[in-house]
């Protein structure tokens, strides 16, 4: 249904029936129009039917736009819902005052016909007074529409809240006028009284309802007599009474019109034409049928000829269509803003959930700590009570024995005294003398009995404890550590200040993307400047032998220029990095030597290798697999993150998600940076020395510096409000202006081919990322197979290399004779690494761009040897610099013929061959990451050389099979692994046999490949509460892997030791989680807290069962009984000792003799 509303703001003070805002309603739905065409009626004639009325009555309002809009069905009240796909075409226009914003759509005119199709809640909100809750479809209620789009009856309109003075343009210049300010009782928004208009949506809907449903009560719409209509003019679209029909037929202009009887009129032909026309307030007899574009108001024909003479005007239908387009644009913008608001609401909800989860977690930890202390206090109290009872019982027994002896003696004395006294007083002399001997003996015997007059005092038993000391220290029992997050740019700027042009093809994009593209272009321009300086410096190096003295002067000048240029570039880079840091929170890791290294020219941006499993998976293998393994590329990054950059990882993750939602910043595009690799990779013994040597070396000495990528830790796919802008796809040459600029820049600065006769070849960085840069900038590049058979100057050929190329991957890394796999990331993005030379202005770029090396292996090694002969060699460096290794990374190194680029036209067809029939998997079987992988020739599994067990020293040559496929008794191949046994013969004799070693390696590799074993591959972080208090002998699979190597000092002597350690990993997990169940007694929310720890416990049980099954399969002839853990034995012995009386420190005998009042100290 089409609705037009327009009003003027400066015509008066808003009457009840003839307000300043004059509104004209002309309704028409798509369905009604189609049906009208099928009925051969005039298209301009609006019709009223139950179907058309059910779509919104007087029209449906747009979502927060200044005009009303109709659609099927009407949207619910705010927040505004997204419009249906057909809404922009059916949206209505309203040229009202700027202060009026509509948000509502009136209900269907007939409740009987629309009750089944339209929900009741939106109807009540749209056609009901917000104060008295009465229906507004009454003609006498005078419905009013407020600027906040709430409808009120005229009697329910709130009284003016205050008055303000507004400047107005008067006849004599600037003037002021007092305006009433009112406040909506529903939404409490302030508005001016003059901005309030009649709600013609409801009024005309009510009239349309009465006319379309009850034809018997239809009144004439051509006159003002309110006479009953008996006919309907099809051409005019008006109901006519008997008098009007006669007049209609008499007038020459309308006498040919077709008039139907009321009973014959179909609802489709009537439509909403039963609405009364809105008449001009000046010319009472003229309807408002024109729209003045100049004045933005509805006019009648007379007004257009008089007051609006020579103004631009349109008919209502044409103006309605124009306003529809404007409204559709506003709707698009508002829908985008609605998405941002909903995303912000969801983020707030997430933060609330995080707060609740943090509360539960910390509460759980506090209860564990308190419960642990309570347990220890109870134990100590029971032990003290037991010791006290033992001491007092012993003393009581001794005193009771003395008491019995004394009682017996006292009775004996009384008896003897009584008998003697009776014998003396009552007995005869003969009897006394006769019994004297017995009486005297008994008296002497009792007299000899030794009785102490004062028994020895008891030794004092005292309890020494300072309650005040413990009460004071309870304050320091535990503290809450609240980590502060770095301040970020307010997200409101992103939502409020975004401007989207009407009719934009991509409504999801924001203006901040232009800044991002400019940022990238600035980086490339800086890299171009650095490239020019590199050329100049290389030129000075070539002339060094001829003009040594002149070279020194030029070198000093060049260094000064470089320092100035580097300072400028460093300042600009710091500004850019600050913006990048605000957007992605990826600040550079503070390393040793960073101030010296940061003086390099700013590196180019690197297209991020896709994130994997929601964790921190950047470029997993920046080097070939036998290079330094980057810690930042692993799934277990959170444990290493606080050590690397000093910032807690869990608190950083939500902040990154908020900052990535701001499209005005750099987004998820990491920057290559130079770092001290030894901090990230402890297994590299010489990388630190190389970095330090580079810092103390002059600018003319070449060096191979490892490059570390800082990956973004936020998956952009999880951010719905991010702009839908793809990263710079450097592989698709010519696809964008940036790509063309980049291609021209690279081709203009490319060096000629460096052959073996070149006196000073430029050193190149042995990095697949660097070679990926070379290949990605060329529109067409030859594949690795195109270099087969090509010869260098020495006449030797490069061995053909099988490269597993995934769809969409433009980066190639070749190994001689081995199957090397370059993977695309899991989210489908191409792994195109674009970086500058790591030496900055000190090192020239790669000699050949876009082509695979065609020179011989010996030439390459000799060329590299000349460049790095002054550098210390590391075991972890690429075997490209080792002449003894046959597995050579040929991609990215210098060839001998620059004309090889001419064969680049067949590159794409060759690289895409064989992609579909590749039987190998796409991800490493252990770490589930992509990168350069070794493909087994007998099974589909692939591995990184550092993930395989045993770990390989370098990439193998020829056919290769994994540990799963190799024969245990008689292996087909021997691995080139850095696992030389110790020279001590005794240790070799005590070690496992080679077959047992291979069996243990296969069993451990099975465990590593289990999908639930990730939690057990690394040591448990110290942040896990009370873990190292409960677990006294921690163990992890990586430690088992190291101990399985024969060079390890604690190498396993038998498979039983190996099995025992693996079982210890899972028993520790079960023990820790079993301990956590004790907290149920003191926890109010038992199930939730226990369930939080049960996931790792269930994973431990599953992997343990899997390990036992594989153990029976690999060692069928051996049995490995479960040995009681050392910790359990120690605890059992400790409990036995606690129950005994040995813990009581007995008093020394020397003090017993000296001091009878000895103090007995009890533990």
UniProtKB/Swiss-Prot annotation:
A zinc finger (PHD-type) spans 921-968. GO terms for cellular component: chromatin; nucleus. It is found in: Nucleus. GO terms for biological process: developmental pigmentation; embryonic hemopoiesis; erythrocyte differentiation; fin development; macrophage chemotaxis; macrophage migration; neutrophil chemotaxis; neutrophil migration. It catalyses: S-ubiquitinyl-[E2 ubiquitin-conjugating enzyme]-L-cysteine + [acceptor protein]-L-lysine = [E2 ubiquitin-conjugating enzyme]-L-cysteine + N(6)-ubiquitinyl-[acceptor protein]-L-lysine. Signal peptide: none annotated. Residues 27-38, 821-830 have a biased composition (Basic and acidic residues). Residues 345-369 form a coiled coil. Residues 580-590, 870-889 have a biased composition (Polar residues). Pathway: Protein modification; protein ubiquitination. InterPro entries: Bbox_C, Bromodomain, Bromodomain-like_sf, Zinc_finger_PHD-type_CS, Znf_B-box, Znf_FYVE_PHD, Znf_PHD, Znf_PHD-finger. Residues 1-119, 524-555, 575-599, 656-706, 753-848, 867-918, 1128-1147 are annotated as: Disordered. A zinc finger (RING-type) spans 129-188. Zn(2+) 2 binds at residues 280, 283, 303, 308. Residues 991-1114 form the Bromo domain. Zn(2+) 1 binds at residues 220, 223, 244, 257. Keywords: Bromodomain, Coiled coil, DNA-binding, Metal-binding, Nucleus, Repeat, Repressor, Transcription, Transcription regulation, Transferase, Ubl conjugation pathway, Zinc, Zinc-finger. A zinc finger (B box-type) spans 215-268, 275-316. May act as an E3 ubiquitin-protein ligase and a transcriptional repressor. Involved in the regulation of embryonic and adult hematopoiesis. Required for normal development and survival of both committed erythroid progenitor cells and posterior mesenchymal cells. This is E3 ubiquitin-protein ligase TRIM33. It comes from Danio rerio. The lineage of its organism: Eukaryota, Metazoa, Chordata, Craniata, Vertebrata. The gene is trim33.
């Amino acid at each position: 249904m089409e609705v037009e509303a327009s009003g003027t703001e400066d015509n008066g003070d808003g009457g009840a029936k003839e307000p300043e805002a004059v509104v004209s309603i002309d309704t028409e739905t798509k369905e009604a129009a189609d049906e009208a065409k099928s009925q051969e009626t005039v298209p301009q004639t609006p019709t009223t039917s139950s179907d058309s009325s059910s779509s919104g009555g007087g029209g449906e309002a747009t979502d927060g736009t200044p005009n009303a809009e109709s659609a099927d069905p009407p949207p619910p009240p705010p927040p505004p819902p997204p419009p249906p796909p057909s809404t922009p075409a059916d949206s209505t226009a309203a040229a009202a005052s700027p202060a009026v914003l509509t948000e509502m759509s009136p209900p269907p005119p007939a409740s009987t016909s629309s009750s089944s199709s339209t929900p009741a809640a939106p109807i009540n909100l749209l056609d009901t007074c917000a104060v008295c809750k009465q229906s507004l479809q009454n003609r006498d209620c005078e419905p009013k529409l407020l600027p906040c789009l709430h409808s009120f009856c005229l009697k329910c309109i709130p009284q003016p809240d205050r008055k303000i003075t507004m400047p107005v343009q008067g006849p004599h210049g600037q003037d002021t006028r007092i305006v009433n300010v009112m406040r909506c009782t529903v939404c409490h928004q302030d508005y001016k009284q003059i901005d309030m208009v009649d709600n013609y949506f409801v009024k005309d809907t009510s009239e349309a309802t009465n006319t379309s449903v009850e034809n018997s009560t239809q009144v004439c719409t051509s006159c003002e007599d309110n006479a009953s209509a008996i006919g309907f003019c099809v051409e005019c679209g008006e109901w006519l009474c008997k008098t009007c029909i006669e007049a209609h037929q008499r007038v020459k202009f309308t006498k040919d019109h077709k008039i139907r009887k009321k009973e014959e009129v179909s609802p489709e032909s009537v439509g909403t034409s039963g609405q009364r026309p809105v008449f001009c307030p000046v010319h009472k007899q003229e309807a408002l049928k024109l729209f003045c574009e100049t004045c933005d108001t509805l006019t009648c024909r007379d007004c257009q000829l008089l007051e609006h003479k020579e103004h631009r005007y349109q008919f209502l239908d044409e103006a309605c269509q124009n306003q529809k387009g404007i409204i559709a644009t506003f709707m698009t913008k508002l829908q985008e803003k609605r998405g941002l608001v909903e995303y912000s609401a969801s983020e707030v909800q997430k933060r609330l959930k995080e707060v609740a989860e943090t509360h539960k977690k910390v509460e759980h930890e506090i209860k564990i700590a308190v419960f642990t202390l309570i347990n220890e206090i109870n134990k100590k109290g029971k032990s003290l009570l037991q010791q006290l009872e033992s001491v007092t019982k012993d003393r009581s027994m001794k005193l009771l024995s003395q008491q019995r002896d004394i009682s017996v003696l006292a009775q004996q004395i009384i008896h003897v005294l009584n008998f003697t006294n009776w014998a003396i007083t009552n007995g005869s002399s003969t009897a006394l003398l006769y019994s004297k001997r017995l009486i005297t003996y008994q008296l002497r015997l009792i007299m000899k009995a030794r009785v102490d007059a004062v028994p020895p005092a008891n030794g004092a038993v005292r309890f020494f404890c300072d309650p005040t000391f413990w009460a004071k220290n309870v304050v320091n029992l535990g503290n809450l550590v609240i980590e502060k997050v770095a301040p970020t740019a307010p997200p409101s700027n992103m939502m409020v200040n975004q401007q989207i042009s009407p009719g934009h093809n991509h409504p999801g994009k924001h203006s901040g993307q232009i800044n991002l593209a400019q940022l990238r272009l600035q980086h490339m321009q800086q890299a171009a400047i650095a490239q020019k300086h590199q050329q100049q410096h290389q030129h000075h190096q070539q002339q060094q032998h001829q003009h040594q003295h002149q070279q020194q002067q030029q070198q000093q000048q060049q260094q000064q220029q470089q320092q100035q240029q580097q300072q400028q570039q460093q300042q600009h880079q710091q500004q850019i990095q600050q913006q990048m840091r605000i957007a992605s929170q990826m600040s550079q890791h503070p390393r040793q030597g960073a101030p010296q290294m940061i003086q390099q020219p700013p590196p180019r941006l690197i297209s991020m290798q896709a994130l994997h499993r929601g964790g921190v998976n950047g470029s997993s293998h920046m080097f070939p697999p036998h290079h330094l393994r980057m810690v930042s590329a692993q799934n277990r990054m959170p444990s290493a993150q606080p050590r690397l950059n000093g910032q807690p990882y869990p608190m950083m993750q939500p902040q990154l998600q908020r900052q990535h939602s701001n499209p005005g910043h750099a987004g998820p595009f990491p920057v290559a940076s130079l770092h001290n690799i030894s901090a990230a990779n402890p297994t590299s013994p010489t990388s630190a020395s190389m970095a330090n040597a580079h810092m103390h070396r002059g600018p003319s000495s070449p060096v191979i510096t490892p490059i570390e990528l800082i990956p973004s830790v936020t998956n952009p796919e999880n951010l719905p409000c991010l702009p839908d802008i793809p990263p710079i796809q450097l592989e698709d040459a010519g696809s964008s202006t940036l790509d063309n600029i980049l291609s021209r820049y690279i081709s203009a600065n490319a060096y000629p081919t460096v052959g073996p006769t070149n006196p000073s070849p430029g050193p190149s960085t042995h990095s697949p990322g660097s070679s990926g840069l070379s290949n990605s900038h060329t529109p067409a590049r030859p594949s690795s197979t195109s270099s087969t058979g090509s010869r260098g100057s020495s006449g030797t050929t490069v061995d053909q290399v099988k490269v597993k190329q995934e769809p969409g991957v433009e980066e190639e890394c070749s190994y001689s004779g081995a199957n090397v796999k370059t993977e695309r990331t899991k989210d489908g993005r191409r792994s195109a690494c674009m970086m500058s030379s790591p030496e900055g202005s000190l090192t020239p770029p790669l000699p050949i761009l876009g082509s695979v090396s065609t020179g011989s292996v010996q030439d390459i090694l000799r060329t590299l040897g000349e460049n790095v002969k002054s550098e210390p060699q590391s075991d972890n460096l690429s075997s490209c610099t080792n002449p003894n290794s046959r597995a050579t990374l040929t991609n990215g190194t210098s060839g001998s013929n620059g004309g090889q680029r001419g064969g680049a036209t067949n590159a794409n067809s060759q690289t895409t061959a064989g992609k579909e029939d590749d039987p190998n998997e796409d991800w490493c079987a252990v770490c589930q990451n992509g990168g350069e992988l070794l493909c087994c020739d007998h099974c589909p599994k692939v591995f990184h050389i550092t993930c395989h067990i045993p770990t390989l020293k370098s990439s193998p040559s020829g056919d290769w099979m994994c540990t799963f496929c190799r024969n245990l008794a008689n292996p087909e191949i021997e691995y080139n692994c850095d696992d030389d046994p110790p020279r001590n013969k005794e240790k070799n004799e005590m070690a496992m046999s080679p077959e047992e070693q291979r069996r243990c390696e296969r069993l451990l590799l099975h465990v590593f490949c289990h999908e639930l074993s990730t939690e057990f591959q690394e040591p448990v972080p110290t942040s896990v509460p009370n873990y190292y208090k409960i677990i006294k002998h921690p163990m992890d699979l990586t430690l088992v892997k190291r101990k399985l190597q024969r060079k390890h000092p604690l190498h396993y002597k038998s498979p039983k030791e190996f099995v025992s350690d693996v079982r210890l990993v899972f028993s520790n997990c079960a023990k820790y989680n079993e301990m956590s169940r004790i907290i149920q007694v003191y926890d109010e929310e038992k199930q939730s807290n226990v369930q939080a720890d049960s996931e790792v416990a269930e994973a431990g049980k599953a992997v343990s069962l899997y390990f036992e099954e594989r153990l029976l399969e690999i060692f069928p002839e051996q049995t490995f009984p479960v040995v009681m853990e050392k910790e359990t034995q120690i605890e059992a012995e400790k409990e036995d000792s606690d129950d005994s009386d040995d813990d009581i420190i007995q008093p020394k005998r020397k003090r017993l003799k000296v001091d009878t009042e000895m103090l007995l100290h009890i533990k």
